[in-house]
Swiss-Prot record:
It is found in: Cytoplasm. It comes from Nitrobacter winogradskyi (strain ATCC 25391 / DSM 10237 / CIP 104748 / NCIMB 11846 / Nb-255). ATP binds at S10, F11, H18, G94, L95, R96, E104, V129, R130, P131, I132, T133, A134, T135. One of its GO terms (molecular function) is pantetheine-phosphate adenylyltransferase activity. Reversibly transfers an adenylyl group from ATP to 4'-phosphopantetheine, yielding dephospho-CoA (dPCoA) and pyrophosphate. NCBIfam families: coaD_prev_kdtB, cyt_tran_rel. This is Phosphopantetheine adenylyltransferase. It catalyses: (R)-4'-phosphopantetheine + ATP + H(+) = 3'-dephospho-CoA + diphosphate. Belongs to the bacterial CoaD family. Its cofactor is Mg(2+).
């Protein structure tokens, strides 16, 4: 039975931290599905279609190189429901620090109660990407700062275009 993993997130924007998680995740599964969340009430910088396209462009080559099947989808329901829809039994979550661990453990516990067949796997961030958050990247970009150390080149270019003033 193939190991199918779901890596959910808003990916607004895709960061080098997300890319780090994908590099680890493709070694843990036979098929990785990146799920771009669409949440009512949130106003993302990039549309769901843009985030999906950027995620696919950045992550798919990593999966292909690792010999891992890959797909990218959007979802607007519970993460465990999205996992069930695509046949995933593994949820991949990145951890930067203890604060992330505390938060993610709560979510993992709730998810396991709702879907005992779906297991959360935590991937610790590599040291070079631990300080990166999409929120900080957005703040830097909106103020005209250079985000290229924190995001893939494609994303840096899209952010420059988005916030060119």
């Amino acid at each position: 039975m193939p190991r199918v993993a779901l890596y959910p997130g808003s990916f607004d924007p895709v960061t080098n931290g997300h890319l780090d998680v994908v590099r680890h995740a493709v070694a843990l599964c036979d098929r990785l599905i990146v799920a771009v969340g669409v949440h009512p009430g949130k106003t993302p910088v990039f549309s769901a279609d843009d985030r999906l396209a950027m995620a696919r462009s950045v992550f798919e080559p990593v999966a292909v190189e690792a010999g891992c099947a890959f797909d990218c989808v959007t979802y607007d329901d519970l993460t465990v429901a999205a996992a069930h829809k695509v046949g995933a039994t593994i949820l991949v979550r990145g951890l930067r620090d203890g604060t992330d661990l505390d938060y993610e453990m709560q979510i993992a516990g709730m998810n396991e109660t709702m879907a005992p067949d779906v297991h959360t796997v935590f991937v610790p961030a590599s040291p070079g990407v631990r300080p990166i958050t999409a929120t900080l990247v957005r703040q830097i970009a909106t103020m005209g700062g250079d985000v290229s150390p924190f995001v893939p080149q494609l994303v840096a270019s899209r952010l420059r275009t988005k916030f060119a003033g």
